[in-house]
């Protein structure tokens, strides 16, 4: 391999995940960290470590100059951005490549295209992906907006062209609200992302969030690794993910998988990507593409046996895809619980010292986490501290194993979301697989959370 030393431009469990894949390939690792993460597990385990700034992300994990300097002084020949932070920053990818450092990610132009939600929708349509009815591009004129909304049919949703996470999104149920809500969505988008551009789509009543994992070699070859169901969400943030989806048939998987793989091949896409759809009444509607590794990638690894991070590194190194589409078999069922350092019912962050820690174990149980007893969870970053991934031959068997694994997980000191997951696993709707993206918030409201 040409890659001998890899800089990990991230923190937490994903930094550790990348380190593990690199070491299994005989590649040295460089950890970059803020002062708040000096004692983090990935920093302890890496072959080299460089402090790149104070705790605030803008001064450390988003500090492009500091990261490039760290790569140069440690002679790193590749950078893996993980997820979040700079992972979908096309300018950063260009700067990395301009410094003759291998970028472990898609081509910068594809990151840029898919990062602009309007351009992404246009591109997806041109590639043959099914779209939600709505505007072809940005909407600024109220009369035009009313005509689009009438054609799509109320209710409609107004969305920010840049960013996500629920900011700059407004649901409109009638023409009289439209102008006000467009202004509100634009203001929110401007404040959050520096871009007031918005567009309009048909608002689906009770959809599921289904996403397909794709991989391309950048040379016109691409595969899909099936779907994940990420419908259990709170405020547009995923809580639990499973693969395969309880509602997608093998025929649907093959049909949509073929469509997304062809789209990526036609695009010349390189590396890992996720194409997200809303699914309702048997129909798929493209919402966005993430040009990076996803938090929930382990459930796909569990049912396919493909190491996605290893594949990312191989492709960035110029090697072909290690598997062909016909080699991929979908076996069994996997569920991931995101364990956050927060109150399980109020969702208030709960940073601080971990006084004791014991990871669940046993057959087909995986825990991705950098926690250890005595570690202090910093208050500056995302609250996710661990991912519990469980595999079973059937969905029912997987759920039973997950219940057992959650009983075994011990994290004392901070409050965690473990009790939330335990409660979810007793709910008839979850057990039957009958839930939509609205289900979790409605369930929490009924509980008074």
What are these regions (language model features)?
Residues 155:
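Active-site neighborhoods of enzyme catalytic cores
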Residues 134-135:
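Conserved beta3 strand of the protein kinase N-lobe
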Residues 1-127, 139-147, 397:
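ATP-binding N-terminal substructure of ATP-dependent carboxylate-amine bond-forming enzymes
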Residues 60, 85, 113, 138, ...:
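Alpha-helix initiation/capping motif
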Residues 2-3, 8-25, 49, 72-74, ...:
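ATP-dependent carboxylate activation and anion-phosphoryl transfer catalytic cores
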């Amino acid at each position: 391999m040409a890659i001998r030393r890899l800089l990990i431009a991230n923190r937490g469990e994903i930094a550790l995940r990348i380190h593990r894949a690199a070491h299994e390939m005989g590649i040295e690792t460089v950890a970059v960290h803020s002062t708040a993460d000096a004692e983090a597990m990935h920093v302890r385990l890496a072959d080299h470590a460089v402090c790149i700034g104070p705790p605030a992300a803008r001064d450390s994990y988003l500090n492009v100059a500091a990261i490039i300097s760290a790569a140069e002084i440690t002679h790193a020949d590749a950078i893996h951005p993980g997820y979040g932070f700079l992972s979908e920053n096309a300018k950063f990818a260009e700067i990395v490549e301009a410094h003759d450092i291998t970028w472990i990610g898609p081509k910068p132009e594809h990151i840029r295209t898919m990062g602009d939600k309007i351009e992404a929708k246009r591109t997806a349509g041109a590639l043959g992906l099914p779209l939600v009815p709505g505007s072809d591009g940005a909407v600024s004129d109220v009369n035009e907006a009313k005509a689009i909304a009438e054609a799509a049919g109320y209710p409609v949703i107004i969305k920010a062209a840049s960013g996500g996470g629920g900011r700059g999104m407004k649901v409109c149920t009638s023409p009289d609200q439209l102008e006000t809500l467009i202004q509100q969505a634009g203001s929110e988008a401007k404040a959050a992302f520096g871009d007031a551009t918005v567009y309009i789509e048909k608002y689906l009543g009770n959809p599921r969030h289904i996403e397909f994992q794709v991989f391309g070699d950048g040379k016109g070859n691409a595969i899909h690794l099936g779907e994940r169901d990420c419908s259990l969400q709170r405020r547009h943030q995923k809580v639990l993910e499973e693969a395969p989806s309880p509602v997608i048939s093998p025929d649907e998987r093959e049909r949509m998988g073929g469509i997304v793989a062809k789209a990526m091949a036609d695009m010349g896409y390189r590396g890992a990507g996720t194409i997200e759809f809303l699914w309702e009444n048997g129909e798929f509607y493209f919402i966005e593409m993430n040009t990076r590794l996803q938090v929930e990638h382990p459930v796909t690894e569990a049912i396919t046996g493909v190491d996605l991070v290893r594949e990312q590194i191989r492709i960035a190194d110029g090697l072909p895809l290690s598997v062909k589409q016909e080699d991929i078999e979908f076996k069994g069922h996997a569920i991931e619980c995101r364990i956050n350092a927060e109150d399980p019912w109020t969702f208030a962050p709960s940073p601080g010292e971990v006084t004791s820690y014991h990871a669940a174990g046993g057959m087909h149980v995986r825990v991705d986490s950098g926690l250890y007893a005595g570690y202090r969870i910093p208050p500056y970053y995302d609250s996710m501290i661990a991912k519990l991934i469980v595999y079973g031959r059937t969905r029912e068997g997987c759920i039973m194993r997950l219940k057992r694994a959650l009983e075994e997980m011990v994290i004392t000191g901070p409050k965690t979301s473990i009790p939330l997951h335990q409660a979810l696993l007793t709910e008839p709707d979850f057990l039957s697989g009958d839930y939509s993206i609205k289900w979790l918030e409605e369930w929490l409201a009924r509980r008074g959370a």
